[in-house]
Amino acid sequence: MRIMFMGTAAAEGYPALFCVCDRCKKARELGGRNFRSRSQALIDGRILIDFNHDALYHSKLCDIDYTYIKSLLITHRHEDHFSPYELNYRNRGAANLDEGVEKLQIYGPSDIKPPLERFIRDDNNYGFDVNTVEPFEPFDVEGYTVTVLKAVHGGGALIPYIYLIEKDGKALLYAHDTGILPDETFDYLK
């Protein structure tokens, strides 16, 4: 299993936009790899994790063509992980795709569905489908077993997830942007 981290920073990026602390000043001075964009990753060139405002930058920086990516896991609906507006650009009128390109299958917590529903159109033959997933219920994504696990982040109104991704005897726990995990998540992982 190969993971490409395209972005590893928090919402403010690094160095932070308006920060003048010594670390951010030094990062600006050094440049290059000291700059970090918002969280996004790609598993084996097939499964994308999170889609934020830096997605266009990531596609250029990492030479990734999102057109043929069929699966997207969303960890939570904060904008540094999830941008429904960017996903709208996959719809007719904004994108001209090759015939036969499959709809993007988006998997995530139930609270990502309402902001995406406004972009789902009946005449859309290559946009996306939204699949809500529940904790501790493994499901298949392109031959990978994906298990949603509960995370702690952002207060009570947010539904944050982390993902356990397994294939061919290998496992990846993708656990970004979370506090101390709930006991039931630790119990599941034992």
Residue spans for each PLM region:
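Core dinuclear metal-dependent hydrolase active-site scaffold
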Residues: 1-64, 132-185
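Active-site metal-binding motif and surrounding structural segment of the metallo-beta-lactamase
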Residues: 46, 51-105
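Alpha-helix N-cap/helix-start capping motif
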Residues: 53, 110-111
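Catalytic metal-binding/acid-base residues of hydrolase active sites
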Residues: 78, 111-112, 179
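A short helix-to-beta-strand connector/capping loop
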Residues: 102-103, 123-129, 142
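Extended hydrophobic secondary-structure segments that form protein cores and membrane-embedded regions
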Residues: 105-109, 132-133
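A short, active-site helix/loop in glycosyltransferases that binds the activated sugar's phosphate group
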Residues: 111-120
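Inter-motif core of Ras-like GTPase G domains
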Residues: 189-190
